C-alpha cells in the first residue's frame, strides 16, 4: 500500500505535491520528492562527500593522535581534533540517514532515528560552531605572544571540550522533543509535530536558535580572528622570534579560511531552515532542490575542513610526507644465510680477501656496552692467534730481556749496531 501510494506521489505534478504537503514540517532529513532524478543525485553526492571526508578526517585525526603520543598535546591541536571528530561523526551517522531517506522516499528507519536525526546533526554542527569561537580566542592569545604557551593542562582541555559538547547538545533539544513519526496519506513520515501549547515556545526557538548557533559564534570568531591577524602583521615587522611569528600567521590564516568556508557552505541550510520554520499559511514552500542541495553543502563542510588542514598546515604536510616515505621505502626484511667456512680452509677468492679492519673490528654498540655484555661478546667471538705472536708475548711475560734490566742502555747501543753489521 505504501509503495503504491509513493508511486502515485512520484508520478504526480510537483505543484499538487507542494500544495498537499504545504502544512507539514518534515524532520530527520526526510523530504518526499516528486522527482526520480533528485532521489538519485542527492544520495550519490552524499556518498561521494562521505567517502572523501572520511578519508580526510581520518588522516587529520591520525596525525593529531600521533603528535599527542610523541609530545604533550596543545590547546589548538586538541580543538582541531574536536572539529575532526564532529565532522567524522556527521559523515558516519547523519549523512547516511539523509541518503537513505532520499532513496526510499518513505520513512522506515524507526521512531528513535526520526527523533534523534535532526538533534544529532545540529548538535555536531553547534559543537563545531562553538569550537571555532574557542579556536579564534586561543589563536588570538597565541598571536599576541607566540613564545608563551596557552594553557595546555589535560584537565583544562578536557573541561573545555566537555563544556562545548554539553552546550551543543542542549541547544537543539526541542527538536528531539517534537520530532516523531506520523502516517499521512498512507505513508510513514518523519515530522515535527508541535502541539498548540508549545507553539509560542517553538516560534521563539525558531528565532533564537540560528542566532545562538550561527550568527553570534560567527561574529565572535570573526572578531578574534581579525585581532589575531592584525597582531601577526604588527609582530611580523619585528625580527625577534621570527619563526614563531610566521607560524602564528600561517595558523591564523588556516583557521580563518576554515571558519569562513564553513560559514559560506552552512548559509544555504540556514536560509532553508528559516524559510521552513517561519512559513506562513498559504506561503510558498522552498524548492525541493534548494533544500536538498543545502543539506549536501552542509555535509560538504566535513570534507572541506580536513582538506584545508592538510593543504595549509606545514605540520600536517610534513606528517603526510613522512607517512608517504614510510610506505614507499618499507621493504620486507631479508634474512641472509651465513655459510660457515671450515677452520682449515682459509683460502679466499682473489679480490675478495677481507681487509684486516673487517677481521678485527668490533661493533660500536658492543664496545660501548656494559662490562658484562663486552665479556659475553669476547667469549662468543674467538679471534685466531698466530704461533709466532703467541711465543713473543710468552717470552716477554715469562723472562724479561737483558735490555729491560740494563741500567746504561745507550752505551751498548753502538755495539748492537756493529754486531748487526
UniProtKB/Swiss-Prot annotation:
CDD domains: 7tmA_GPR151. It comes from Rattus norvegicus. This is Probable G-protein coupled receptor 151. The keyword Protein transport does not apply. It is found in: Cell membrane. Belongs to the G-protein coupled receptor 1 family. GO terms for molecular function: G protein-coupled receptor activity; identical protein binding. Residues 346-381, 394-421 are annotated as: Disordered. Residues 66-74, 144-156, 226-258, 311-421 are cytoplasmic. Exclusively expressed in neurons of the habenular complex. The expression is particularly prominent in the medial habenular nucleus, whereas the lateral habenular nucleus exhibited a lower level of expression. The chain crosses the membrane at residues 45-65, 75-95, 123-143, 157-177, 205-225, 259-279, 290-310. Keywords: Cell membrane, Disulfide bond, G-protein coupled receptor, Glycoprotein, Membrane, Receptor, Transducer, Transmembrane, Transmembrane helix. Glycans are attached at residue 18. PROSITE patterns: G_PROTEIN_RECEP_F1_2. Residues 1-44, 96-122, 178-204, 280-289 are extracellular. Gene3D superfamilies: Rhodopsin 7-helix transmembrane proteins. Residues 364-379, 409-421 have a biased composition (Basic and acidic residues). InterPro entries: GPCR_Rhodpsn (IPR000276), GPCR_Rhodpsn_7TM (IPR017452). The keyword tRNA processing does not apply. Disulfide bonds join 114-190. GO terms for cellular component: cholinergic synapse; plasma membrane; presynaptic membrane; synaptic vesicle membrane. It is a multi-pass membrane protein. One of its GO terms (biological process) is G protein-coupled receptor signaling pathway. PANTHER family: G-PROTEIN COUPLED RECEPTOR 151 (PTHR45695:SF1), LEUCOKININ RECEPTOR-RELATED (PTHR45695). It comes from the Eukaryota.
Amino acid at each position: 500500500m505504501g509503495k503504491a501510494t509513493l508511486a502515485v506521489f512520484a508520478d504526480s505534478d510537483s505543484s499538487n505535491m507542494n500544495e498537499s504537503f504545504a502544512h507539514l514540517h518534515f524532520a530527520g532529513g526526510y523530504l518526499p520528492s516528486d522527482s526520480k532524478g533528485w532521489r538519485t543525485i542527492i544520495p550519490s553526492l552524499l556518498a561521494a562527500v562521505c567517502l572523501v571526508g572520511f578519508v580526510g578526517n581520518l588522516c587529520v585525526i591520525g596525525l593529531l593522535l600521533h603528535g599527542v603520543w610523541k609530545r604533550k598535546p596543545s590547546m589548538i591541536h586538541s580543538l582541531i581534533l574536536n572539529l575532526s571528530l564532529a565532522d567524522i561523526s556527521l559523515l558516519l551517522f547523519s549523512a547516511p540517514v539523509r541518503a537513505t531517506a532520499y532513496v526510499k522516499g518513505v520513512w522506515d528507519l524507526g521512531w528513535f532515528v526520526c527523533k534523534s536525526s535532526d538533534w544529532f546533526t545540529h548538535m555536531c554542527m553547534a559543537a563545531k560552531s562553538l569550537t571555532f569561537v574557542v579556536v579564534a580566542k586561543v589563536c588570538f592569545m597565541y598571536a599576541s605572544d607566540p613564545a608563551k604557551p596557552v594553557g595546555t593542562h589535560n584537565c583544562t582541555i578536557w573541561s573545555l571540550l566537555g563544556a562545548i559538547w554539553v552546550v551543543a547538545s542542549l541547544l537543539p533539544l526541542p527538536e528531539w522533543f517534537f520530532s516523531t513519526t506520523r502516517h499521512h496519506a498512507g505513508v510513514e513520515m518523519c515530522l515535527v509535530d508541535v502541539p498548540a501549547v508549545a507553539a509560542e515556545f517553538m516560534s521563539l526557538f525558531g528565532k533564537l536558535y540560528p542566532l545562538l548557533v550561527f550568527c553570534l559564534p560567527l561574529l565572535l570568531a570573526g572578531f578574534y580572528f581579525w585581532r589575531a591577524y592584525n597582531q601577526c602583521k604588527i609582530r611580523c615587522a619585528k625580527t625577534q622570534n621570527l619563526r614563531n611569528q610566521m607560524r602564528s600567521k600561517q595558523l591564523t590564516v588556516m583557521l580563518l579560511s576554515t571558519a569562513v568556508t564553513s560559514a559560506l557552505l552552512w548559509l544555504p541550510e540556514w536560509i532553508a531552515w528559516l524559510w521552513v520554520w517561519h512559513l506562513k499559511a498559504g506561503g510558498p514552500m522552498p524548492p525541493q532542490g534548494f533544500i536538498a542541495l543545502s543539506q549536501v553543502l552542509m555535509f560538504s563542510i566535513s570534507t572541506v575542513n580536513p582538506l584545508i588542514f592538510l593543504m595549509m598546515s606545514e605540520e600536517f604536510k610534513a606528517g603526510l610526507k613522512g607517512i608517504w616515505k614510510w610506505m614507499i621505502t618499507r621493504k620486507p626484511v631479508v634474512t641472509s644465510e651465513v655459510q660457515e667456512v671450515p677452520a682449515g680452509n682459509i683460502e679466499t677468492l682473489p679480490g675478495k680477501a677481507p681487509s684486516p679492519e673487517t677481521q678485527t673490528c668490533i661493533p660500536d654498540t658492543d664496545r660501548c656496552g656494559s662490562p658484562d655484555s663486552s665479556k659475553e661478546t669476547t667469549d662468543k667471538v674467538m679471534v685466531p692467534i698466530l704461533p709466532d705472536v703467541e711465543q713473543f708475548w710468552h717470552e716477554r711475560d715469562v723472562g724479561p730481556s737483558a735490555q729491560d734490566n740494563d741500567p746504561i742502555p745507550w752505551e751498548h747501543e753502538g755495539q748492537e749496531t756493529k754486531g748487526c753489521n
